[in-house]
Every structure is written in C-alpha cells, then in structure tokens.
Design a protein with these regions (language model features):
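Conserved AMP-binding A3 loop
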Residues: 115-120, 248-249, 256-280
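Conserved AMP-binding/adenylate-forming
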Residues: 132-181, 288, 297-303, 342, 376-503, 509-513, ...
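AMP-binding/adenylate-forming catalytic core of the ANL superfamily
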Residues: 146, 171-196, 211, 330, ...
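Adenylate-forming
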Residues: 149, 191-210, 326-330, 346-392, ...
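Structural core segment of the AMP-binding/adenylate-forming
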Residues: 159, 163-237, 344, 352-353
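AMP-binding/adenylate-forming catalytic domain of the ANL superfamily
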Residues: 223-226, 548, 579-604, 617-646
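Conserved AMP-binding/adenylation subdomain of ANL enzymes
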Residues: 277-297, 307-347, 362-363
Length: 648
C-alpha cells in the first residue's frame, strides 16, 4: 500500500515558527546534534534517553530547589527512578514569569456566561483556597478529593493542592455516588470539595444528597467543603483564607494526583503520578507537540473525570491560555462548541473522534459563515479517528487547519503518538511517535515490526509513567496491568502499526481483537467501514467463540432517526465492510440497538459486553456506576439469556 497523499503540510513560515524547530536548532547549537528530520530527532530522543530529558530540563529552564543527582537512577521498568534527589514545585512552574494582567483561562458553561480569569485572578483564587485548606489542616501528602465540574474554581483548587504538596483527585459531578465512593474510598481523602449541583442538557441536577452519601461513606473525610455552583453562591462562608501563594519544595516523585482507570470490570485502579514526571512530560507535550505559543487559546472538551482535563491544565505551563467548558456538547445542538470556539477566539479545538463523527453524520457546517478565523488546529483523541473524519475536517474548515489525531492513556496522562506541527497530515494516520516515547509494535514473540500490526509497547521508561497504584503495596497490580506479557516492557493494550515513514495507525484495543480464520483485525477498522454508511450513527462489533466452529461475529448498530434495518441496509453494511476491511470480517449477524454502552470517558464497552454474552454475570462483567449509559447494557443481558453464544 502506497503512502497516502498529505491532507495538510505546514507552510515554511509555520514550520519555522514552531517551538520544535527552535528546539532542534538549540540542540545543534548547544550539543552539536544535526538532526535533519523528525524521525532522526525521535530516534535520538529514545536512544539517548537521559540526554534527551536533560535537554528538556535545560531548554525549558526547569528549576530545582535541590538539584538532581542524575537523570535516571534505577532504569528498569516498573520502578524507574527519575531525577533522584531533586526537589521542585509543579505549581511554581505554572505561575512562573506570568504577567498578572494576561489572560490565563476563558470559561463558559450552561450555567454561566462566558468569562475569563487573568493570571492575577487565578493566583489570588489559588492562594485563597490554599490558605483555606491549610486552615483545615491539609498538608504535604494529604489527599484532597474534588467532586467538581470543569470550571475555573476547580483549576484553582488543584493548583492550591499542588502548591501545598497535597495530593489531588477528582471525579466529575455526573458520576454516581457508588462510582465516586469506589474511587475516593481507596485513597482516603482528608477533605472533600463538592458542588451543590450542575446543569446539563438544559436540566438542573441537585447533587447535595449524593454529596452527603459520598462524605458519609468515605470515612476518612474530616471536612466537606461545598461550592455553590447551581445556586451561584460560591465557596461556603469561612472556607477561603488569606495570604500570599507559597510553593512547598517537594521531592521530584512526590505524588501530584491520583487518576483512575475506567473500572468497568472491578474497582478502578488508582493511578498515582509524580509531580516532577508530569512537569517534564507536560512541558514537552504542550510546547513541542501541541505547539502552544504565546497568545494561543487551547481548548479540549473534557470533564474532571477524564485525564484530558489534567492534560489541558498542563498547557498553563506555556504562555498560551486555556478554554474551559462545562455542559452537554450537544445541547441545544452540536454547534454549541463551535460557537464557543468563535466566541473565545480558540486557536486549537480539542475533542473526541466520536464528536467529530457525530458532527459529520449530522451534516454540520461549523465554519460555513467563516466564523472561525483564529482556528489553526484541531485535535482528536479517545478512539481512532476514521478516515472520513479527517476528510470532513478539511472539507469544513479548509486547507490551513492542522488536524492531529493523538493516542495515549490515563496511565501516563499523555499521548504516545500524535501531533507533530512540522510534519504533514495523512488520512487515517497519526503523524509520529512522541519524543522520549520508545513506542514500538511487537509481535507475539517480542520482535519489533514495521509495516505490520502489533502490540503497542513502550520499551524505555517515561517520566509520567505511574509511580505506583495507590494501595498496591507489593506492586503486583501494577505489574499485572502493564508488564505481564513482556517482562520489563510496558504493553499498553492497543494494536498499532508503525509505517515505514514513521507515522502510526491505531487499530483499537488488542484485548477486543477480531480473529477470523487466523486473520487478526482491530475493531476500529470495522467501525471505520460501518460508520461510513450514512444511516449508521454508532456500532459495536464482537468476536465470540463457539465450540467446534470459527466463532460468531455479531455487529450491533445504532441508526439515525427514521432509518430501518432492512435487507437493503444490512447488505449495504456488509458490502462496505467487505470492500473497506476484508471479506473475512463481514459479520455473521447485524442487529439494531438503541445505544452502544460506553464508559464515563466515552470508550466503547467491547470486552465487558463480550463477557456478558459468554455467560459472565453482568455485575461481574461491568460496573454500572462506571458507565455513561448503564441502561444500554440491558439489551445484552437479555440477549445473553436467550441463547448460549459459546455453544450454539
């Protein structure tokens, strides 16, 4: 298969302005490194790992209250030791060299009109919350749990915790009580910050009873502090303190926050990231891969229950500002976020592949009137972006927009592969492997392959890998999660292909692979074909084993209003899969469903649904509290009772 023609190339002027160009020139001047291409730069960054991360420290002037003894102490994974002996402050770097009158963030929600906070305001709010927490006895190592939405007060609360050395953990207010208790209960927070309610899709949701249930159930909580968001009253009286913002010098590996896995098949894994590792990774990612420049305004739709919120806050390490939105991105229609882009002058619009697909299916024309003159980049993540999604962005937004699809994980709070502002964009491909990320595709024997689909592995340590899972005293849960297949090598659980030119293609989760007649295929290839059928809005495909046969592969589809799953549509779906994927991967059956089950972060629930249809008890296969639409499971539970798919 030949190389697809680029959909976009940076102009010479744009490539010259990119921070990564300045960085490469600096490497040549200070280290004599003449790296003529991005691929050469990437290879150097993973071959000379210590030298690369030392260059990031020097180029971005990372400051330490105590200097590190070396870049890497223990090198083996898991347990690589980064910058032993160093002390620094993540929060101090966020606020460093910021003009108090410049804008730090812009915000909007279904409850509030668009507004903005200057750096002076953000610092003032952060100082007041930090003083309030200190008055409650919060100090270094204490956990502060937040049941807060994506609003400026939440950013300030996180930075307040970081300044004190307290460990932050957040859950979005739409999470149910059981889901939040399953998360916060594991880390035993001292303080719970929570809202009274929120508005979503035009409806008000009072969460006071849920908050009380959480506070009563998480027995470590000594103090509940309420933020009146729904009623507009703000922080409860007496909470905010006074005084200047101070920054506690902390060990490089001091925990910054606890994130969580989806928890679809058990208690969510509490993933702990060190403040120094996140600092280095976010400096690299925001500057060199997002190309966040002074004056830029970056947005990524997220809730506080998804790592993209933490990722977006990291952009504040640059001289760009960020844009926050709290609410339903489809209310009152799919034009809401595009209108926000126009009103806030966004330069980068970050979203999910599913949102782009929805806009495309709805026939949306976000820039039909030329309302997005400042938009220079669009980012996509969450799942592989279909080729049609690439084409739709360029058809709608024009040839000058840089579209970067990116893939990573909560586990590392960053992307392994994705945007490179100086490389061309090709349909269906991610531009390159991230600097310092030794991404490879491995076959089952542990051999690196190019031009073939393999397991996505990371063969060298990264600073933002988890320092541990909370409560995993012997590290067994951590090792089992990433290192059980290839000892000492991080196996992420995705299928990936590295092309001969260094781009990447993600094919979906390797634990939900379709295997037909010995030919393996990622589910994303089938979804790309199916979602190209105009009447299909969403889909779920499974490969179910059967005794004595090659298995049974059903396809479940969500149709647009008014569409009917008749013989003609079934034939069209199968024909598209046969032509765009492979004749081997035409489904045995096509069925209509109302919704595809998804996690709270939007991921399709392939493996748990497969387990239900193979006879696993629903409560063991999936935690309903971890789902965005738990009622979508009911269809599959009923279906599993109709027949035994494993034997029929």
């Amino acid at each position: 298969m030949g190389s697809p023609e680029p959909l976009w190339k940076p102009s010479p002027a744009r490539a010259e302005r990119a921070t990564i160009t300045r960085y490469r020139r600096w490497l040549e001047q200070t280290r004599g490194l003449k790296l003529g291409s991005y691929e050469e730069l990437w290879r150097w960054s993973v071959r000379d790992l210590e030298e690369f991360w030392l260059s990031i420290i020097e180029f971005f002037d990372v400051r330490f209250s105590r200097e590190p003894e070396k870049v890497l102490g223990r090198r083996e994974m898991p347990g690589a030791q980064w910058l032993p002996g160093a002390r620094c402050s993540y929060a101090e770097h966020i606020f460093r060299d910021k003009s108090p009158d410049e804008i730090a963030l812009r915000h909007a929600s279904e409850l509030r009109e668009p507004g903005e906070w200057s750096w002076g305001q953000l610092r003032e709010h952060t100082a007041a919350i930090a003083a309030g927490l200190r008055n409650l006895g919060v100090g270094e190592g204490d956990r502060v749990a937040a049941y807060l939405p994506n609003i400026p007060e939440t950013v300030a609360a996180f930075l307040a915790c970081a300044s004190l050395g307290a460990i932050w953990s957040s859950a979005a207010p739409e999470f149910g009580a059981r889901s939040v208790i399953d998360r916060f209960g594991q880390i035993e927070p001292k303080v719970l910050l929570a809202i009274d309610g929120y508005r979503y899709g035009g409806r008000d949701f009072d969460r006071r009873q849920v908050v009380r249930e959480i506070a009563d159930s998480v027995r470590s909580v000594q103090r509940l502090v309420t933020l009146g968001y729904l009623d507009g009253s703000g922080w409860e009286p007496g909470f905010l303190g006074s005084g200047d913002l101070e920054f506690s010098p902390l060990d490089f590996a001091h925990p910054l926050w606890v994130l969580y896995s989806s928890g679809t098949t058990g208690l969510p894994k509490p993933i702990v990231h060190g403040q120094g590792g996140i600092l280095l990774e976010q400096l690299k990612k925001s500057h060199l891969h997002l190309d966040a420049q002074p004056g830029d305004r970056l947005f990524w739709f997220s809730t506080t229950g998804w790592m993209m919120w933490n990722f977006l806050v990291g952009v504040l390490l640059t001289e760009a500002s960020i844009v926050l939105y709290d609410g339903n991105p489809g209310h009152p229609d799919l034009g809401t976020l595009w209108t926000l882009a126009q009103r806030t002058g966004m330069t980068c619009f970050g979203t999910s592949a599913a949102f782009i697909s929805s806009c495309m299916k709805a026939g949306l024309e976000p820039a039909s009137g030329g309302e997005l003159p400042n938009l220079r980049a669009v980012g996509s993540t969450g799942s592989p972006l279909a080729r049609e999604g690439f084409r739709w962005i360029y058809d709608q937004l024009g040839p000058d927009v840089w579209l970067f699809s990116t893939s990573g994980g909560t586990d590392v709070c960053t992307a392994f592969v994705g945007g490179v502002p100086t490389l061309p964009v090709r349909e269906g491909e991610l531009q390159g492997r991230a600097l310092g990320c030794a991404v490879e595709a491995w076959d089952p024997e542990g051999r690196s392959v190019v031009g073939e689909v393999g397991e996505l592995v990371i063969s060298q340590p990264m600073p933002s890998m988890p320092i541990y899972f909370w409560g995993d005293e012997d590290g067994s849960r951590y090792r089992e999660s990433y290192f059980s297949m290839y000892p000492g090598i991080w196996r992420h659980g995705d299928w990936i292909e590295i092309t001969p030119r260094g781009t990447a293609i993600i094919y979906g989760r390797s634990d939900s692979t379709i295997n037909r007649g010995g030919v393996r295929m990622g589910t994303s290839e089938i979804y790309r074909a199916v979602l190209d059928v105009p009447d299909v809005l969403d889909a779920l495909v499974l490969d179910l084993p059967r005794e004595g046969t090659g298995g049974w592969m059903p396809l479940f589809v969500v149709l647009r209003d008014g569409a009917k799953l008749d013989h003609g549509l079934v034939a069209a779906i199968k024909r598209r899969i046969r032509e765009e994927a492979s004749p081997r991967h035409v489904p045995d059956d096509v069925r209509q469903i109302a919704e595809v089950p998804r996690t709270l972060s939007g991921k399709v629930l392939e493996v748990p649904v497969k387990r239900i249809l193979m006879g696993t008890a629903p409560e063991q296969a999936a935690s309903r509290e971890s789902l965005a639409n738990p009622e979508a499971l009911d269809y599959f539970v009923a279906l599993a009772q109709e027949r035994d798919f494993a034997r029929d």
